[in-house]
Regions:
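N-terminal carbohydrate-binding/catalytic regions of secreted carbohydrate-active enzymes
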Residues: 39-112
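Catalytic pocket-lining loop regions of alpha/beta-barrel enzymes
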Residues: 113, 159, 166-289
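Mid-to-C-terminal alpha-helical segments outside catalytic/metal-binding sites
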Residues: 4, 26-37, 46, 50-69, ...
């Protein structure tokens, strides 16, 4: 057999290998459509590995598309610090709200070929949530980039160390500026993704829950996605599962994003926790969203997808399909395999 014939005889095996490697581990348990519902294109230095590398990593683990946004804060490099910070926790220099992040994202996406561009649904986030002008600034962006923006977020409310390092007063979800953002989102029929710690560091009672309850009650037409089920580093609320159940029952406009450490620290903490959270997701199948929460760099992107496989295995096919893409696509007004742009509600 000559080399050419030998190559063609191996081609089916090669194609099969490529097909298998393009899906998450345990792919037989995963739905056909996977949407990353929480992804930062930029890090705290407003830098990124770029779209080309990102899409290659998405292909490695079978992710079809992603909701993507910049980073609302930037880390300051102080004059008396010789080593440049690479993360907001690199040192004790301050952070500040950075409005350029949305333009960096949207302009970078505009430059991509259609094959890449069509896989991303941009959100906007570059505002100071304590500023009563914030909603007006977001409206300007919605008008500046018509048909290109699918939501608002990730907007930072209470966020432990990040809140402490950021210039200005601590934000909270029921601040008047936040309430006006929710009104804007309802007007445009787009969701808001918000990071709001449910409690303080090492405080077991959910002391900041009331602020989110007020936010949700302010405008029931505003769909609010609560990032990480309100959890961050060193946030230890033993009753989180029960609180989440009650909140979903009482607030029809609430959705939970299970990205980042809430999955490791709570949902997949042990076998019992995983089963209990799977039951809650089955109870409210339309209200949970999967995401990676990667921040500008993609080397470990596939692992942040495949970590959900144990949970996916416990869910019904219909619920799994909603968690891994259906719920987010519905919230942003997109049907699977379609490019429907969000439209402003008639006034």
């Amino acid at each position: 057999m000559n080399r050419k014939k030998k190559w063609f005889s191996l081609l089916p095996m090669v194609l099969m290998l490529v097909f298998v490697l393009s899906f998450p581990a345990g792919a037989a348990d995963w739905p056909d459509t996977i949407v990353d519902g929480h992804l930062h294109y930029l890090d705290f230095l407003q830098q990124s590995d770029g779209f080309f590398k990102l899409t290659r990593k998405m292909d490695e683990c079978g992710v079809d598309s992603a909701v993507i946004f910049g980073m609302a804060m930037a880390k300051q490099w102080d004059e008396n610090t010789e080593t440049a910070p690479t993360y907001y926790l690199s040192n004790d220099s301050r952070c500040y709200y950075y409005s350029g992040t949305d333009h960096l994202l949207l302009q970078a996406l505009r430059k991509q070929p259609e094959s890449i561009k069509k896989r991303f649904y941009p959100f906007i986030c570059g505002i100071n949530p304590n500023d009563r002008y914030a909603a007006s600034q977001l409206r300007n962006l919605l008008e500046m980039y018509p048909g290109e923006i699918y939501g608002i977020g990730e907007i930072m409310s209470r966020h432990d160390d990040l809140t402490a390092l950021t210039y200005g007063e601590p934000p909270h979800a029921d601040h008047p500026a936040f309430l006006e953002i929710f009104d804007l989102a309802a007007e445009y029929d787009i969701p808001v993704l918000i990071h709001h710690n449910i409690s303080g560091v090492n405080i077991e009672d959910p002391i900041y829950l009331k602020e989110m309850q007020n936010a949700l009650a302010h405008n029931r037409d505003a769909d609010i996605i609560w990032a990480h089920v309100g959890i961050s580093r060193r946030i230890t609320v033993p009753t989180l599962l029960q609180v989440a159940d009650k909140m979903l029952k009482e607030n029809s406009n609430l959705y939970y994003d299970i990205s980042w450490i809430v999955f490791e620290d709570y949902i997949n903490k042990d076998e019992k926790s995983l089963k209990d959270w799977a039951k809650l997701i089955e109870k409210y199948p339309d209200r949970f969203i999967l995401g990676t929460d990667k921040v500008g760099h993609w080397d470990t992107y596939p692992q942040e997808v495949t970590k959900y496989t144990p949970l996916i295995k416990l869910l019904s096919d219909d619920t799994a399909a909603k968690l891994t893409g259906g719920n987010m696509l519905r919230l942003i007004g997109v049907q699977e395999n379609a490019a429907v742009k969000p439209v402003k509600k008639a006034s």
